[in-house]
């Protein structure tokens, strides 16, 4: 069967015999092909994009959602929000295929996944359903061709650590997210690179992994502060984690920033409401959400992208949680 004939069947053309049409449809079924119900949507401008989170919504996610919604409001695009747990990403292939087929049948034109653990099974299911995927701040990239939107995490980690070094700190710890997360690895590499530029060694136990959560900052921050030689500064991989470190410091009677300096990452509302306000690396989260939606719509329209990976600039915002080390 020729490509032209398959195209005619997919587009409902009448100039195809019943026998040929049946053969093509059988082949499509055999290869798990799912047609998207978006042709009419493109003509009417009624498009829907699926926005998928990993099962938790926090201040970071809220900023991403805001960026997506602000752009959707000016693009006549509907956004459907859903949550998927890590276990759902690692489900049997038939369940992943059913998930993607369900999205296609519901008229979704693309999927945006935020901080998700994307698997090869996800990619296969979405490809079969002809649903383009854009990942925001991916935990992993199983395929170099996966389109992603993120920020300059390495630069952010480097600048945050250089700021602390510039204040005179030498005992600087890094408390990040999951060790395998791409964004965390980049921030950690930036931290290590900055330490190397000043020939400052990283003591054993000064690099810790968590899940970018407040509780990590409290518990792991306490472990750091209870070390025989505790750090005088902590660079945290997220604002919630940094806020947790502040709490661990207060519980030990430490003053911020006189006794301990803390830097966060993201510049969410948590950073602005902390006491003192948190020095942090600003990720342009709303812009990342906006860029993800624009990119998803371009892919859904069949456009070719200049690059599959977009990184938006980070910026260090110095507030009240950092100062010189104690004398």
Predicted regions and their residues:
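N-terminal helix-turn-helix DNA-binding module of bacterial transcription factors
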Residues: 1-45, 326-327
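Glycine-rich phosphate-binding loop signature in dinucleotide/nucleotide-binding domains
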Residues: 31, 104-108, 167-168, 224-230, ...
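Alpha-helical recognition/docking segments in bacterial nutrient-uptake
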Residues: 44-162
């Amino acid at each position: 069967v020729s490509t032209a004939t398959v195209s005619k069947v997919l587009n409902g053309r009448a100039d195809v015999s019943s026998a040929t049409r049946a053969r093509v449809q059988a082949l499509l079924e055999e290869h798990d092909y799912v047609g998207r119900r978006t042709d009419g949507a493109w003509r009417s401008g009624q498009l829907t994009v699926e926005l998928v989170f990993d099962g938790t919504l926090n201040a970071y996610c809220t900023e991403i959602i805001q960026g997506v919604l602000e752009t959707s409001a000016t693009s006549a695009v509907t956004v459907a929000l859903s949550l998927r747990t890590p276990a759902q990403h690692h489900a049997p292939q038939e369940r992943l295929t059913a998930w993607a087929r369900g999205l296609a049948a519901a008229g979704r034109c693309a999927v945006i996944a935020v901080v998700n653990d994307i698997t090869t099974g996800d990619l296969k299911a979405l490809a079969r359903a002809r649903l383009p995927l854009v990942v925001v701040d991916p935990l992993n990239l199983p395929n170099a061709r996966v389109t992603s939107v993120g920020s300059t995490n390495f630069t952010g980690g480097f600048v945050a650590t250089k700021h602390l070094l510039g204040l005179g700190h030498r005992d600087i710890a890094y408390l990040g997210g999951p060790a395998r997360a791409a964004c965390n690895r980049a921030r950690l590499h930036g931290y290590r690179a900055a330490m190397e530029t000043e020939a400052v060694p990283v003591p054993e136990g000064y690099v810790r992994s968590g899940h970018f959560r407040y509780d990590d900052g409290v518990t792991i921050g306490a472990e750091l502060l209870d070390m025989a030689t505790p750090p005088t500064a902590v660079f945290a991989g997220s604002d919630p984690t940094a806020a947790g470190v502040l709490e661990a410091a207060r519980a030990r009677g430490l003053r911020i920033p006189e006794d301990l300096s803390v830097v966060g990452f993201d510049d969410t509302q948590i950073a602005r409401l902390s006491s003192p306000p948190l020095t942090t690396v600003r990720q342009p989260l709303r812009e990342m959400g906006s860029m993800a939606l624009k990119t998803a719509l371009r892919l859904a329209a069949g456009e070719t992208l200049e690059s599959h990976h977009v990184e938006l600039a980070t910026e260090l915002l110095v507030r009240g949680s950092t100062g010189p080390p104690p004398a």
